[in-house]
């Protein structure tokens, strides 16, 4: 039996080793979160004391509704009150985001997702994916339905999924969705003032037999660098090179790019599907290939001003280690 209590103040335990683990959700009351009622209270029980101030911006409900979630704080327990305007036939998710922390200010690494429903079932559709390029704190925005780009700035997303280098999200309805990646998403700014990355298609469709695997890419801010001609010449033996061939369904021109946080090396795929990149600095790299629709040698990720989405890109499944005076061969990389 779960006993709730209140007191004048909640104090963190004294002494002991420094806590570096984020809080964990132990249980909910009720344990089964279907057939709920409008305005029902749900108790969240954690394994340690939660910092009360962190709750203010940590509890979200998706799909978004106009009414806020109210909560009461009891140290290791938080009682939330559901809005009174939920749809009977929808699955909602309570998302505890990375603002949530314990009394030692240790924040969540990943969102805690709690599916709930006023009906007797929970939706089962899901998406997953990875983020590539240079970014700080990306989020995935989902709108249910096929939404025209011109309407996105004026429409609140139905779901906001916090991410790092990868993401997954479930309990969605089987339907079509418009999807967008945003770095350092700030809902107080107009959407076009955020850093955006579109998917390669206008929409995704979730079915029982299809869990889309979505890739997004964020480019670095453009910075022009002037090369000092006195320092360009280096011993060729200090470099590595990479050769390979690509098979699959693609449309030329295709740019093959080898990149890490410090360097980027590019070449075009030849008509016979072969590529070679010379004079590569030693290091660990990711290998990309993308269909360069506008021939600018940049992986364009779309914008709100026209109908273009992200250029379709592919990522070699393993990271590559290149060493000086050494050639790495990539055989039969399959892309589709």
Language-model segments: residues:
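Structured interaction patches on ligand/partner-binding surfaces of diverse proteins
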Residues: 110-111, 185-224, 293-330
